[in-house]
Amino acid sequence: MATATVATTPEGIPVIILKEGSSRTYGKEALRANIAAVKAIEEALKSTYGPRGMDKMLVDSLGDITITNDGATILDKMDLQHPTGKLLVQIAKGQDEETADGTKTAVILAGELAKKAEDLLYKEIHPTIIVSGYKKAEEIALKTIQDIAQPVSINDTDVLRKVALTSLGSKAVAGAREYLADLVVKAVAQVAELRGDKWYVDLDNVQIVKKHGGSINDTQLVYGIVVDKEVVHPGMPKRIENAKIALLDASLEVEKPELDAEIRINDPTQMHKFLEEEENILKEKVDKIAATGANVVICQKGIDEVAQHYLAKKGILAVRRAKKSDLEKLARATGGRVISNIDELTSQDLGYAALVEERKVGEDKMVFVEGAKNPKSVSILIRGGLERVVDETERALRDALGTVADVIRDGRAVAGGGAVEIEIAKRLRKYAPQVGGKEQLAIEAYANAIEGLIMILAENAGLDPIDKLMQLRSLHENETNKWYGLNLFTGNPEDMWKLGVIEPALVKMNAIKAATEAVTLVLRIDDIVAAGKKGGSEPGGKKEKEEKSSED
């Protein structure tokens, strides 16, 4: 590492080209520092990998505790300083946003690839050759997945359920996974849309509402929307069947003028007329709503007490201060339109639901809008005895929803339990001699790194990793055994597809792409220049200001 002086002239005169306080790490030292950062993050995550993985307790600066084994959450909560570590976290977050799962696979594979690259660097193999070999190996790995992946359609409910079960199996909610998997498949199938010849799934249309209390098995799927608000007036009905719903992005209040204005009142009758006029304005708004046939009003803004009174008199159920996102979901669920001007509201703008009802959930009251003809928005109401259980259930459900959506969108699935990884490694070892040279070593190293995932799965299950890896290699020599992986609960190799351990092909492919991209990016860096901290000797810094004041 060098500080301010980083270069010399041919005559040996030092030339300062970086400010004091800056630092530079270059060559092999920079490469090793970056590889060490990748390996350190892998070490932090690998004990959570697989269905027998452990959980992490994360405590933030305020003392708030999070207990989870969700890769994206762990990385998000880790306060990393090293720039390469931050880079890896960004890539992992991209994986989570793209496929909602496979974050740990991407990070752990990146760590294994970094370890193998380090071994090759010690053998004096240039980073460029390693990068080239890794890129060729990545192509073979992706092609292998494409070759062996099984087609899955939205009607293959049994396969989709197994995908959800596999995702939930590695979470803290594994005890309730059978029940939750059914909810996940029904929710995704309900919001899926056929566009052309491809299915599209927008998971924003699956609303997740959390309420502490009850047990995980009290979690329910609502074919509609749950509004976390209560009915605004005690005189209003709490249950409306065959509901015609007005969705308002306008307030049911007397609007104040934009300009500052004063009203001079000389006697009490003028005050009475003023208040009477305000009341008439609100009554007209309520009459306008009632004239459309609406018997439910869900408003994003406020509802005046006078308006509440008139709505209650007409037997209209009303909710105020609903979230904008809830209003948008309600529009999709009920077929209604969100209206910004009450004067423009017509009967064609109303949404329909078989039932709108206020129910008590735990200590709070909520309004359930359900039973629409073909809702394209649904809700999952999560219950749990502890707040942390509810939070972890939400994370588990989001991952499961994402994996099922991935299979529906992509239309392909593969077996888990290391079956895909061992098949990729087998094909890479057959391909490597065709390339020859030093790149062959990089491709073989890639195969070993892929197998490293299986060894970590075995370690976390308390099994002998080398013994199990050898068994799988032997089985995969036979082409008919391509789905053989490791049953981590019995410790024996089994046909993972028949066992029901199924994952989205898209998650596997994206994890391989993300890991390879991360490591090749790291291997190309041979120089790290870090600027000095603010407040040092840079312009405007404290030191410079002190020097200037002393000169004055």
From Swiss-Prot:
Keyword Membrane: no
Biased amino acid composition, Basic and acidic residues: 540-552
PROSITE patterns in the cross-refs: TCP1_1 (PS00750), TCP1_2 (PS00751), TCP1_3 (PS00995)
Protein location: Cytoplasm
Reaction equations catalysed: ATP + H2O = ADP + phosphate + H(+)
Induction: Transcription is induced by heat shock (shift from 75 to 86 degrees Celsius). At 80 degrees Celsius and above ThsA and ThsB are the major proteins synthesized (at protein level).
GO cellular component: cytoplasm
Transmembrane segments: none
Enzyme class: hydrolase
UniProt KW keywords: ATP-binding, Chaperone, Cytoplasm, Hydrolase, Nucleotide-binding, Stress response
Source organism, top-level taxon: Archaea
Region entry Disordered, spans: 531-552
Main location: cytoplasm
Alphabetized GO MF terms: ATP binding; ATP hydrolysis activity; ATP-dependent protein folding chaperone; unfolded protein binding
Keyword check for Cell membrane: no
Temperature dependence: Optimum temperature is 75 degrees Celsius for ATPase activity of the isolated complex.
Catalytic activity, EC: 3.6.4.-
InterPro entries, per database record: Chaperone_TCP-1, Chaperonin_TCP-1_CS, Cpn60/GroEL/TCP-1, TCP-1_chaperonin, thermosome_alpha, Thermosome_arc
Protein purpose: Molecular chaperone; binds unfolded polypeptides in vitro, stimulates protein folding and has ATPase activity. One of the most abundant proteins in the cell at all temperatures.
UniProt cross-references to PANTHER family, sorted A to Z: CHAPERONIN
Family under the similarity heading: Belongs to the TCP-1 chaperonin family.
Subunit and partners: Forms a heterooligomeric complex of two stacked nine-membered rings; one of alpha and the other of beta subunits. Sometimes called a 'rosettasome'.
Protein name: Thermosome subunit beta
Organism: Saccharolobus shibatae (strain ATCC 51178 / DSM 5389 / JCM 8931 / NBRC 15437 / B12)
